[in-house]
């Protein structure tokens, strides 16, 4: 056993010696790394684009009996508030069919811009102030305040401010089910679509729209009448996306002639749900379920 151990030890020592000789004869390879170079990179900020839906769309001509006739009446004034704190009120800044406004960024920051449009409408069949904010074009959105019954007229103002054609899918949700329609919009095209051409005598409806690839501007114009008397006009932008919690800021009505405010709720899901409404007034709090 001692002899065998000595033989194994001798072989191991010889192998170690030979490995040292081979290692010593191998060329030495050195690795070098490039010295890092610091460079300043400037990122061009994306411009902020807003779109104003434009002036009042009159359906059926001034008399209301001209089939298929839709005219944009007058001009809507545009007011801008810049991120620098400057308010721009230019009497020459108006639009009829809609306008795209762009705020170019600076110092790697997107420019800030807030824009509204307003128009006083005075026609035989329409009277009132039509005003709204100007929003960013969107790929999809909701409206839940639609009305298309007797004495109520709703017109969709569709605009494609992009450089590509798109297909807009409209889904009207009425108490009896769903009604769909598709509208093709070329680049830069604006179209006024009377809702009465799609649905008929629906006092309450919701609308979901979605495009095939580029964002568009959609606004809902409403006109109300009582017999031969006009009751007012309105212009609305898409509602906020469905959420668990929503906050609606209060209003102070300082003039007679307005109808009482109505809260409209819409459950877009397939399961029933319960809504808890907390109304806060100056002197009390009311909770409804």
Report residues per predicted region.
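Extracytoplasmic/periplasmic/luminal assembly and interaction segments
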Residues: 56-98
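Short beta-strand/loop motifs in extracellular/secreted proteins, especially
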Residues: 63, 74-77, 154, 164-169, ...
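Intrinsically disordered, low-complexity Pro/Gly/Ser/Thr-rich segments with frequent PxxP/GP/PP motifs
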Residues: 80-100, 175-206, 282-289
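Short acidic, flexible loop segments centered on an aromatic residue
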Residues: 155-179, 265-286
């Amino acid at each position: 056993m001692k002899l065998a151990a000595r033989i194994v030890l001798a072989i191991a020592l010889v192998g170690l010696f030979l490995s040292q000789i081979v290692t010593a004869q191998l060329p030495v390879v050195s690795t070098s790394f490039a010295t890092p170079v610091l460079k300043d990179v400037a990122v061009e900020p994306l411009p902020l684009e807003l779109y104003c839906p434009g002036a009042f769309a009159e359906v059926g001509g001034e008399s209301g009996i001209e089939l298929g006739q839709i005219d944009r009446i007058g001009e809507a004034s545009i007011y801008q508030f810049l991120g620098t704190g400057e308010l721009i009120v230019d009497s020459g800044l108006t639009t009829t069919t809609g306008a795209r406004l762009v705020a170019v960024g600076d110092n790697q920051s997107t420019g800030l811009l807030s824009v509204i449009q307003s128009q006083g409408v005075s026609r035989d069949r329409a009277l009132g102030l039509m005003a709204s904010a100007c929003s960013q074009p969107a790929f999809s959105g909701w409206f839940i305040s639609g009305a298309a019954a007797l004495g109520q007229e709703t017109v969709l103002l569709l605009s494609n401010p992009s450089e590509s054609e798109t297909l807009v899918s409209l889904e009207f949700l009425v108490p009896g089910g769903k009604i769909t329609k598709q509208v093709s919009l070329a680049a830069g095209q604006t179209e006024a679509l009377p809702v009465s051409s799609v649905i008929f005598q629906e006092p309450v409806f919701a609308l979901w729209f979605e495009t095939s690839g580029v964002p568009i501007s959609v606004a809902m114009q409403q006109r109300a009448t009582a017999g031969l008397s006009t009751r007012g006009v309105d212009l609305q932008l898409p509602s906020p996306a469905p959420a668990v919690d929503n906050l609606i800021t209060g209003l102070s009505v300082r003039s007679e002639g307005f109808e009482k405010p109505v809260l409209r709720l819409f459950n877009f899901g397939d399961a029933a749900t319960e809504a808890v409404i907390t109304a806060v007034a100056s002197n009390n709090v009311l909770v409804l379920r």
